[in-house]
Amino acid sequence: MRKIIITGPTGAIGHALIEKCLSEGCEVFAICRPNSARIKSLPKNAGLHVLEYDLSELEKAKEALPSDCDVLYHFGWAATFGDARNDMPTQIKNIEYTIDAVHLAHACGCSTFIGAGSQAEYGRVEGKLSADTPAFPDNGYGMAKLCAGQMSRVEAQKLGIKHIWTRILSVYGPYDGPYTMVMSTIAKLQAGDVPQFTKGEQIWDFLYSGDAARAFFLLGEKGFDGKVYVLGSGKARPLAEYIKIIRDEVMPGAKIDLGVIPYAPNQVMYLKADIDELVKDVGFDPYMKFEDGIKAIIKG
C-alpha cells in the first residue's frame, strides 16, 4: 500500500491508523469534516494531506485526490452517541454516504474498500462475537451499520473492488471522544470528582487504538474480499475490573461509586470478540495491556 484515503480520521482509531500508515511510508489523504476542531490534533507530516469535505460531499472530494490510491478506510459516520443513534433520517444518510465512499474508492483507483461497522449490529448476544453470529440490532445506529456493510459489499462487487467490513467492539486510546467510559472516567478522576457507574458486571472486551490500527493496516494488505472481521482483543473481564484499573492508574485510592447507576433497558452484558479469523488471515496479535493503554492516554 502506498496511498491511503481515510474518512472520519479524527477519532482514536483514525489517529492511530494515520500514524501507522505514515510510519510504514504511506501517503495519507484524510477527509475531515469542514472546520472540525479536531483537525489540529492530527500529526504534522509531509505525508499527510488534510482535505475538508462533509460526508455529503464525497463526490467533490475526488477532485482533490490522486487517481492511483490503494485503499479507502471509511470511518466517517454521524449520530453515534445517545439518542442520536435512533435518529433514523440521519442513520439512513449514513448508509448513503457509505455507498458514496465506495464510489469514491473506485474513482480514485483503490483496489480495496474497508468499512468500520460496530458491535451494535449484533444487538444483545451472550457469547463470543464472530462474523457468523446472528445480527439482530436493536437501535437505528446498529441497523444502519448492518445495512451499510451489506449494501456497500454489493456495490463494491459491482465496481470490481475488494470489500472488507469490520465490526468494532470497544476501542479506547488517545484522541477518543470525551463521553466514552474510559475517557470520562479519567477526566472525572483528574478533576477530583467521584465517578458513578452501574455495578460493572458486564463482561467486556477492550482493544487499544494502536492495536486496532495495526489490524486495519493488516486488513488493507492481506484481508480477504467479502469477509466480515470482528475487531477486539479476544479477551474479556468484568467492567468493574477495568474501572478499578483506571482509578489505580489515574488516582490511586480515589473513591469510585459502583452500583449507583441502573442498567439501561437494553444493556449489553457480554461483549467479547472471536478474533480467530483476524489471526488466521492477517496475523493479528493485540499486545497492549489495558493498564499500559491507560498509561499511554494519561501520558498523552
Q: Which ranges hold each PLM region?
A:
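N-terminal Rossmann NAD(P)H-binding glycine-rich loop of SDR-like oxidoreductase domains
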Residues: I4-E24
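NAD(P)H-binding glycine-rich loop region in Rossmannoid oxidoreductase-like domains
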Residues: E52-K93
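Conserved Rossmann-fold NAD(P)-dependent oxidoreductase catalytic core, especially the SDR/UDP-sugar
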Residues: H74, A78, I99-G140
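A conserved pocket-lining segment of Rossmann-fold NAD(P)-dependent short-chain dehydrogenase/reductase
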Residues: D83-A84, H163-I164, S170, T185-L207, ...
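Active-site Tyr-X1-5-Lys
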Residues: F136-I164, Q190
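Glycine/proline-rich active-site loop of Rossmann-fold NAD(P)-dependent oxidoreductases
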Residues: L146, V171-M183, D193, S209-G210, ...
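Substrate-binding strand-loop-helix patch
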Residues: P174-Y179, E201-A213, V228-D248, M288, ...
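C-terminal "lid/loop" region of Rossmann-like NAD(P)-dependent oxidoreductases
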Residues: K199, V228-Y229, A240-I243, M251-Y270
